[in-house]
Amino acid sequence: MDVRANLRSIRISPRKVRLVTDLIRNKKVGDAIVILNNTNKKSSVPVQKLVKSAESIAVNNNGLDADRLFIKEIFVNERPTLKRFRPRAHGRAYEILKRTSHITVTVSDGQQ
């Protein structure tokens, strides 16, 4: 059975979040949490919270065995970018793009 959890509008660039999510794809949930604990990236903290949330949903709401859970699917989508401007010399302004992400994780126990 598959269980899905979402984290929406996180203020980290999708490119940076994908570096972390690629490390834990198709891993057991326990192993993924250990990997995220030892990853020195800003995005590893919210991804770890999301994986723990998906695990608790699977165990508490659906009665799945926590030891059999693995990350079946994890992906990062880009949400609309916040555009800001930085003043520059001679009355010009440079655009700053503040990128944000949506993260979706699916955990499964391997059964239908």
Curated annotation (Swiss-Prot):
Keywords: Ribonucleoprotein, Ribosomal protein, RNA-binding, rRNA-binding. Signal peptide: none annotated. PROSITE patterns: RIBOSOMAL_L22. The keyword GTP-binding does not apply. This protein binds specifically to 23S rRNA; its binding is stimulated by other ribosomal proteins, e.g. L4, L17, and L20. It is important during the early stages of 50S assembly. It makes multiple contacts with different domains of the 23S rRNA in the assembled 50S subunit and ribosome. Belongs to the universal ribosomal protein uL22 family. This is Large ribosomal subunit protein uL22. It comes from Spiroplasma citri. The gene is rplV.
